[in-house]
Amino acid sequence: MKKLLALLVALSCAGCQGAPSHPNSIVGTWFVDDVAAPFRYHMYVFNGDGTMQQANPDAGDATTSDSDGKGIWVADGDRIKGKWMEILADRTTHKFAGTMELSFEMKVDHDGFAGTSAPRYFDIAGKETGSEKPTPLTGKRLTLP
């Protein structure tokens, strides 16, 4: 019985994660400054499985309303590369207006990162309607006091 209990405790803790084991790990929660975004401040969460989430206030764009972003990332040497996508809705008609994909590349330095990001826009049929040149992207890790 004790062995079974010990096994159950070990298995339940197997999925638990603490702070990143590497000081330059992207895994964690970040306050992000994207100077070219309609609303420049965002929250990013990078998960250990290569997925990520993005959120920011919806008030930055008067024409479209956007969802939270969901995306993917990979380590490439000492750099992080990734992309997230959000759904766009027309504020007047309340209809699907397309998507925006934001590609990024950055380098993590302990509790900060610096890099660039570049958006691409797609209409409701999935046809690219525009893109922008890369602009600065910086982040500060959310830490406990």
Outline where the language-model segments fall:
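Positively charged n-region of N-terminal signal peptides that target proteins for export
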Residues: 1-4
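Bacterial lipoprotein signal-peptidase II cleavage site
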Residues: 17-23
